[in-house]
């Protein structure tokens, strides 16, 4: 009883405090709203993009080389860096951007895919009366509304259910979520509401039923993060920014200011990672927007600069779509160690995450088995015991590095800033660090404001509120129907193209190959179970894709959805890219191997493989072992103790099934632990044991052998009189 009173008191005090804050901030909020309206009007009157399509990478490199001096040079092609380039170029500043890898190759493509204000930050704002947290939530909610508006094809509101298992939590969480709606104000997506236990189970039938009291549903935004980042960069390029991926900054250029006598940063020495060519790019102002690599650029400027980035790894996993409703997510507000776990539908799959672990900065973060199992255990806690959560159902996993920062100007150097930090060095290098995906635009605005002030640049106000990103302006929810009717694409593919490219989907459809079937007329898929088509590979090159990794992870999202499917699609993707980019056989093989290494280490294939290669005792019942041995010996007719491609082909031919030899080789290679071109009986039994345990969700070889066995067993012996053996 005392505890319940304490909870009520906390709600009343916290709510009252926030109401006071809200009251005091109304005038400021009104002023900001008027300013934002002015910005939207400015965006309406902004000149059309100078380029109908983004210039080619080669054209961008020539611009970088031949421009005597830019106003702004941005280092980093993530969400914040691309946002800075777009903000600067739409103010009329001569802008350049360089990225040493691909756009969104780092943290910006490895997020939870949410556009949110941060419910947990609001909770802290109330409980600790923290005005900074409150302002951060309010800013994020405004930016959430803007992002959903300017890229409607890549983003949408998503209802998220918060299950409640204790009666006293229901009013506590309800007050918190209603305050979230209140802080959003006119930017509230949809009003939150309470569900009874029965209604909660109707919406989310896989929820843990025992002790469930009810649930609260609130709304946040969801997006395709890598494609959103790319849309920002492409929009900046269309407005005239010279943007180039695979351009590494090897050093900063400096010169002495004749008026002040101070040494100032005046550009960067850049290296084309693809060719090795180096040249200088000069600029009045250089912006460091490199996320987790913030300190490495700061130390180029000043080798004694104190580190401000405190990197933290966040791991996510992808599971089959049946683990969650198609259009509703779940929030676990208090995990076993106090963290928050999201469980969300995305691209017809289910994302679960995230973790929060201190880590070292690396361009190639690897998801750990420990973090994967932590997420799986938390998922088990919230799902019904009828749903068997298996390790083998993890189809992909990734780790993203959060660039948490300390403010170098703060007296307390140990405190981590929950908001972004704009730092200006003695030599004029501007660093933007911290923050989160949702607030990339306001971070960019603050950064360019600082650049204009520090370097006396002539520019107008920010014009990016209400400015449509590439593909968003003429998109509509029914656009995909025109793709079906005008081009003969199947509906699933058309919906995917519309949701990925927006009004640019027609250009992809024009490139689609004829299928040779009655229906669909065009649109050859890269893999049968996903709606990605070959035309996207060709179009992806127009979007600055330079490698096979770019294509499987950021132009399409195959690597983030299913690593096995991505590996299956790789040979065809490399073949198509090779034709467009004139790759020789050596280059194609190099691209194939690099992409497989990426899938193996960075996208969770390594952890998946280790579940299969675990040499622990085979745990199968004797009856199962006998059954699987019989299946194996139908292929191993010579009793060699192993099977090869020849054995599989022989059985398939006997049941009139044709299969490409390269595909067969890939299927056997998945199970061939010794990599000797043979699948031994012990390897096959390990595979079946791993499938039964749930370590591995399935295997193409296991499915193939089972299907072949069933076909062989269904054969009816031909009677003697039907075989001309009788009179």
Swiss-Prot record:
Calcium-binding enhance the activity of the enzyme. Residues 1-42 form a transit peptide. It is an enzyme of class 1 (oxidoreductase). Its cofactor is FAD. Keywords: Calcium, FAD, Flavoprotein, Metal-binding, Mitochondrion, Oxidoreductase, Phosphoprotein, Repeat, Transit peptide. CDD domains: EFh. Residues 623-658, 659-694 form the EF-hand domain. Pfam families: DAO, DAO_C, EF-hand_7. It is found in: Mitochondrion. Ca(2+) binds at residues 672, 674, 676, 678, 683. Pathway: Polyol metabolism; glycerol degradation via glycerol kinase pathway; glycerone phosphate from sn-glycerol 3-phosphate (aerobic route): step 1/1. Signal peptide: none annotated. InterPro entries: DAO_C (IPR031656), DAO_C_sf (IPR038299), EF-hand-dom_pair (IPR011992), EF_Hand_1_Ca_BS (IPR018247), EF_hand_dom (IPR002048), FAD-dep_OxRdtase (IPR006076), FAD/NAD-bd_sf (IPR036188), G3P_DH_FAD-dep (IPR000447). Its main location: mitochondrion. Calcium-responsive mitochondrial glycerol-3-phosphate dehydrogenase which seems to be a key component of the pancreatic beta-cell glucose-sensing device. This is Glycerol-3-phosphate dehydrogenase, mitochondrial. It comes from Macaca fascicularis (Crab-eating macaque).
């Amino acid at each position: 009883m005392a505890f319940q009173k304490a909870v009520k008191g906390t709600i009343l005090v916290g709510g009252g405090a926030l109401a006071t804050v809200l009251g005091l901030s109304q005038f400021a909020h009104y002023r900001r709203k008027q300013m934002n309206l002015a910005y939207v009007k400015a965006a309406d009157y902004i000149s059309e993009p100078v380029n109908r399509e983004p210039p080619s990478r080669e054209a961008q490199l020539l611009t970088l080389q031949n421009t005597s001096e830019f106003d702004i040079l941005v280092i980093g092609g993530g969400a914040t860096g691309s946002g800075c380039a777009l903000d600067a170029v739409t103010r009329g500043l001569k802008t350049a951007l360089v990225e040493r890898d691909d756009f969104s190759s780092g943290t910006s493509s490895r997020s939870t895919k949410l556009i949110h204000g941060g419910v947990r930050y609001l909770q802290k704002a109330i409980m600790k009366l923290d005005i900074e947290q409150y302002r951060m939530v309010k800013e994020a909610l405004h930016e959430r509304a803007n992002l959903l508006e300017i890229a409607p094809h890549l983003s949408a509101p998503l209802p998220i259910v918060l299950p409640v298992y204790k009666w006293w939590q229901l009013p506590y969480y309800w007050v918190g979520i209603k305050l979230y709606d209140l802080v959003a104000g006119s930017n509230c997506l949809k009003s939150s509401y309470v569900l009874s236990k029965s209604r909660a189970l109707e919406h989310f039938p896989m929820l843990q039923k025992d002790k469930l009291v009810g649930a609260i549903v609130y709304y946040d935004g969801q997006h395709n993060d890598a494609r959103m980042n790319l849309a920002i960069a492409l929009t900046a390029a269309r407005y005239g920014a010279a943007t180039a991926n695979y351009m590494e900054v090897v050093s900063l250029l400096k010169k002495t200011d004749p008026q002040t006598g101070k040494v100032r940063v005046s550009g960067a020495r850049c290296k084309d990672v693809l060719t090795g060519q180096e040249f200088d790019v000069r600029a009045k102002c250089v912006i460091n927007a490199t996320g987790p690599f913030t300190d490495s650029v700061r130390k180029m400027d000043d080798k004694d600069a104190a580190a401000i980035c405190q990197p933290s790894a966040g791991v996510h996993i992808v599971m089959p779509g049946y683990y969650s409703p198609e259009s509703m997510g779940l929030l676990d507000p208090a995990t076993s160690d106090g963290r928050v776990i999201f469980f969300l539908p995305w691209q017809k799959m289910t994302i679960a995450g995230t973790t929060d672990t201190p880590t070292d900065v690396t361009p190639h973060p690897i998801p750990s088995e420990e973090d994967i199992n932590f997420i799986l255990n938390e998922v088990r806690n919230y799902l019904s015991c009828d749903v068997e959560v298996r390790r083998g159902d993890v189809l992909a996993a990734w780790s993203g590095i959060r660039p948490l920062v300390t403010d170098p100007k703060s007296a307390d150097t140990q405190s981590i800033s929950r908001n972004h930090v704009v730092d200006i060095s003695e030599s004029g290098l501007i660093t933007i660090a911290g923050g989160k995906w949702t607030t990339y635009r306001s971070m960019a605005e603050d950064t360019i404001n600082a650049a204009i002030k520090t370097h006396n640049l002539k520019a107008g106000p920010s014009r990016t509120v209400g400015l449509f990103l590439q593909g968003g302006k003429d998109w509509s929810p029914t656009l995909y129907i025109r793709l079906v009717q005008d081009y003969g694409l199947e509906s699933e593919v058309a919906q995917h193209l519309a949701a990925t490219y927006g009004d640019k989907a027609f250009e992809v459809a024009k490139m689609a190959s004829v299928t040779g079937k009655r229906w669909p007329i065009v649109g050859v898929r890269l893999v049968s179970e996903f709606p990605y088509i070959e035309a996207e590979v060709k179009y992806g090159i127009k979007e600055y894709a330079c490698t096979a990794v770019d294509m499987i992870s950021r132009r399409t999202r195959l690597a983030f959805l299913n690593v096995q499917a991505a590996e299956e699609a790789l040979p065809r993707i490399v073949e198509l890219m090779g034709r467009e980019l004139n790759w020789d056989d050596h280059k194609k093989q190099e691209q194939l191997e690099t992409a497989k290494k990426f899938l193996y280490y960075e996208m969770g294939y390594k952890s998946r493989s280790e579940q299969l290669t675990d040499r622990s005792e085979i745990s199968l019942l004797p009856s199962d072992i006998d059954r699987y041995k019989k299946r194996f010996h139908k292929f191993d007719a010579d009793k060699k103790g192993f099977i090869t491609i020849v054995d599989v082909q022989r059985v398939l031919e006997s049941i009139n099934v044709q299969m490409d030899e390269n595909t067969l080789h890939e299927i056997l290679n998945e199970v061939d632990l010794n990599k000797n071109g043979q699948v031994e009986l012990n390897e096959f039994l390990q595979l079946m044991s791993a499938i039964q345990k749930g370590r591995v969700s399935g295997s193409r070889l296991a499915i193939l052998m089972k299907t072949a066995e069933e076909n062989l067993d269904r054969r009816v012996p031909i009677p003697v009189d039907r075989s001309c053996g009788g009179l």
